[in-house]
Amino acid sequence: MSFLKKSLFLVLFLGFVSFSICEEEKREDEEEENEREENKESEEKRNQEERPPGFTPFRVD
């Protein structure tokens, strides 16, 4: 019986550790994705500021 308890404890502990590692990696991936989106947005804003005021890329006849 003691062997089963120790085995169960070990399995649960290793599962918890692997779950924690996966969650940490997921969080890091989300942070990197957010940084990429922010960089993309800031780059778009910089590109928009280079245009003169009232400029439209569409031709109006």
UniProtKB/Swiss-Prot annotation:
Listed GO biological process terms: defense response; vasodilation
Residue list for modification 4-hydroxyproline: P53
UniProt propeptide residues: 23-50
Keyword Signal in annotation: yes
Region named Disordered: 24-61
Recorded GO CC terms: extracellular region
Source taxon at top rank: Eukaryota
GO molecular function annotations of the record: toxin activity
Segments of skewed composition (Basic and acidic residues): 37-52
InterPro entries: Frog_antimicrobial_propeptide (IPR004275)
Acidic residues composition-biased segments: 26-36
KW Hydrolase (keyword) present: no
Keywords: Amphibian defense peptide, G-protein coupled receptor impairing toxin, Hydroxylation, Secreted, Signal, Toxin, Vasoactive, Vasodilator
Function (record text): [Hyp3,Thr6]-bradykinin: Induces relaxation of rat smooth muscle from tail artery (EC(50)=56.7 nM) and contraction of that from ileum (EC(50)=588 nM), urinary bladder (EC(50)=4.6 uM) and uterus (EC(50)=3.9 nM). Binds to both bradykinin receptor B1 (BDKRB1) and B2 (BDKRB2). In arterial smooth muscle, the effect via BDKRB1 is stronger, in uterus, ileum and urinary bladder the effect via BDKRB2.
Family the UniProt entry places it in: Belongs to the frog skin active peptide (FSAP) family. Bradykinin-related peptide subfamily.
Protein name: [Thr6]-bradykinyl-Val,Asp
Source species: Agalychnis dacnicolor (Giant Mexican leaf frog)
Lineage: Eukaryota, Metazoa, Chordata, Craniata, Vertebrata
